[in-house]
Amino acid sequence: MWKMREFEEKLYKENLYKIAGLDEVGRGCWAGPLVVAICVLKKDYNNKLIKDSKKMSSKNRKLVFEQLNREALLIDWIIYDAEFVDKTNPKKTSIIGMEYLINKHKDKIDYCLIDSEKVENVLVKTQSIIKGDQKSISIASASIVAKVVRDDIMNQLDKKYPLYGFSKNKGYGTKHHIEALAKYGPINKIHRFSYKPIKNLLLNKKE
């Protein structure tokens, strides 16, 4: 048995075939949105390119995203901007997004596999899997969808705000990003002002 399909194979034996994988991307970023995605694959779907999106090249992620668009039974995502993440907190934002997507598509799902998080306000049975994007093809597929969608947004933001290097750092706290923040300050509605590094930067500027 292919390890990336181990959880799915167990569910197939229980006559559960429409298995949704859910994951988020962008939780630890200092800038940009948080994206939550859902993906339902056909039974026994096989694509050896699929793995944890963080371990894939950008080219392969885009290729798999296009394949999933054509071949998956369902893919969908929801985008939460930096303001929402600031008001709600990143963990809760992830859970809200997962619950929304599960309930939106409840009639098309038999069971949900979720990366790390536990959800409660849903009408479908779920299972939380630690490091699920490394263990489940369904979760890994959702991770790829969320990553490609978010990277595209960050590439667009890079065109609007070229001084921050968003196309390269994707909103994470890289050396260049830190230097740009120190020089130009955070961008309203783009940076996450509730995050400690941004808070500290603003405090230092006041002193």
Kindly give the residue locations of the regions a language model identified.
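RNase H-like, Mg2+-dependent phosphodiesterase core
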Residues: 1-207
